[in-house]
Amino acid sequence: MSVLGEGGLAMSSESRRLVIVGGVAGGASAAARARRCSEGAEIILLERDGDVSFANCGMPYYIGGEIADRSKLVVASAQLLRTRFRIDVRERSEAVSVDRAARTVRVRRLVDGSEYDLSWDRLILSPGAAAIIPPLPGINSQGVYSLRSLMDMDRIRAAVDAAPAGARRAIVAGAGFIGLEMAEQLVRQGFAVQVVELQSQVLPAFDADLAAAIQEELVRNGVQVWLGRGLREVCEQGGRVQGVTLSDGTRLPAELVILGIGVRPNVGLAVACGLELGPAGGIRVNEFLQTSDPLIYAAGDAVEYPWGPSGGTARVALAGPANRAGRLAGEHAVSGRCAAMRPVQGTSIVRVFGQTAAMTGLSVRAARRAGLACRSATVIAGQHAGYYPGASNLTLKLVYEPVTGRLLGAQATGADGADKRIDVLATVLAFGGSVRDVAGLDLCYAPPFGSARDPLHQAAFVACNELDGLGAMLDVESDLAGWQVVDVRTPAEVSRAPLTAGTQVIPIPLDELRGRLGELDSQKPTVVSCGVGVRAHAAQRILLQHGFREVVNLTGGATLRRRVVPPESLGVTGDVR
């Protein structure tokens, strides 16, 4: 659908110059789209670095050697933009100020420091974001790096290649997406890696029960994880990093330190010229990417986008929204028309060794922080038919409104299949769907690809059962003291992986439950558990229909519980199904 935005007038023959500040995802997309929509416009792209458009999401994989050819990361060279799109690309040119009244940008040539004024009829700001560099002692030591540009990537790759066999120890500060991707790739390059995270879990955007699987994968691959600690200082000798000291005084030796603790939007240019910021500190835009000055647009990591799951706005430093926003801004700037930017949802994914974590929308923690009432449903199920070779478990969590069932978000972890489930759920979320909509989805199925009852369906069934009063769930991290806890797995399963309940557990296999109801107190609140929750639901229905007053199913069963609440003793563990 094409729509006319505020101030959305096509540039006349007398007003034909579009200036774009910043390249990469937002700016380069804007430039290319603007040219496709207007052959007559003069389009000037200013980029302070030498690389105009590159795949920054691929940089960790070049450092680790998975991507062998550096040139593959260059999405569009300056020369390609000049010849194919007739764009005036000015590399190593920095916009230092904007005069809105005069409609000029002050530009500094970084090669010689000279400056000039550049007039514009429409202006697009795509300044991106900068890595957060904490003001710590030793932070500027040689061997301390952040990763935002190809130059950063080249410096890190050179340090990795030059590191001798006896000095390949790395600290990664921050356990978000970039931090964990870098940890994986440094292990691939033969480094001993330690990850430091200020929060109490890795992947802080996820709920703890899903993030626990990724932490297990890190540990399985030799990565030591330090949670609930930050950096106090970088230790150096002769200007060269020797390690770090954590906030609790722990000293970790290392020859390489990677800072992945977040980014800060580059809004200085916007603030200086009087553009409005949003509540999260990004440039405020409308659905057509116009700022508070309708002749100036903004796109990319410095922008606050409409936030779909809970309303309002949010900064989302992801390539997908930046590309879409740049494309729309470029079209609207030269034609006055474009489709409205849809709200973003933070749909994202990361691979950590043999596991994948993906999410869209709100986690339980984020929903509660936003003041939203929510419930969740978690299942552990095969990513395709169990009888077909290569089946592996996928953990899938839906977050939804407790009365309407409207989907608020979803998370998934597993060796395979997390991506396609989250993509489906992102679509449901974008169109305001509910868990009942998910339960009724018609999805493709053949044994190599899925199950007749997909994990999506199974999670939605759990949610619908709770909405319909057929199966209340208890959060996996709940304190079980005061509950009558019944484990309906077989004796062998219980022995192999005891339920970490912190209280007495009554083991009654499901197939024996009807004959042993007398061993239980029907008036006492009861928690039932199995391996992943399926048999526990059957037990729950039996007990409720035999007059038990309150029966809840422990979300995710013993498998998820043991991730979130570690076993009290070092017993023999194994797969629990």
Residue spans of the language-model regions?
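Rhodanese-like catalytic fold shared by cysteine-dependent sulfurtransferases
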Residues: 7, 436-447, 451-484, 490-527, ...
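Mid-to-C-terminal Rossmann-like scaffold of FAD/NAD(P)H-dependent oxidoreductases
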Residues: 12-17, 302-415, 447-451, 455-483
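Beta1-alpha1 glycine-rich phosphate/pyrophosphate-binding loop at the start
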Residues: 12-89, 94, 183-206, 338-340, ...
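A Rossmann-like FAD-binding core segment of flavoenzymes
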Residues: 40-42, 84, 90-111, 118, ...
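Glycine-rich dinucleotide-binding loop and its adjacent helix/turn
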Residues: 125-189, 224, 285-287, 505-516, ...
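FAD-site-proximal beta/loop scaffold in flavoenzymes
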Residues: 140-164, 236-245, 250-331, 424, ...
